[in-house]
Amino acid sequence: MKRLTVISGAGISAESGMKTFRGSDGLWNDVPLEEICTPRALIRNPRRVMEFYNDLRQKLEHVQPNEAHRILAEMQDSYDVNIITQNVDNLHERAGSRNVLHLHGELTKVRPMDCYTESDGYSTRYVQDIGYRCVREDETGGPGNTRLRPHIVFFEEAVPNLEKAVDTVMQSDILLIIGTSLQVYPAAMLHTYAPYGCRIYIIDPDESPAGAIHGVTHIKKVATEGMREFKSLISNIV
């Protein structure tokens, strides 16, 4: 069974109604990211940060996976599918995908502010799945009973799952990049770890930096339309 690795970004969830962070109508156009998505912002104004993510979490509850998510889940019957997502939503999982690695965290989870250690990184023992409920800025948890924070990788923070993501890409037979402009590092360089002979596809209606790489197939369509074409293109690669 061929190993299909997927690197997904906000574009795959946009058709479900999840607003992207970047782009002409992105969230960062409404709220400066340095006021919301940095460790300093969390310390300076925890209420604003928690309210921002509470609002996103409540919106997530009312959106559904779209056809692109569902096709990827269905492809697990024919391929060893591993998804590396930059998205913090849970739409891949709700569509039925089993192997999903979140690079930038998860909206439906929180963790204590003191659960990071130099030896273990983020201790998953203290990460809590809260579903879609709102979290107050003064809620506490963990062994130190410290304030809870969104289980989100903020700007200026390390990406704990990066090494796992690189290892996954290095073992790929087919690499699909969908819904990401490849502007956010270190995720933007993951495709460079694809092994020799790996077939690389991009689904993005706009130009992509990776699209200029020799041998890359660029499907210039939105996620749902592009996934239909992609599934057909690789149907003979099993």
Name each model feature, range by range:
Residues 1-238:
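Conserved catalytic core of sirtuin-type NAD+-dependent deacylases
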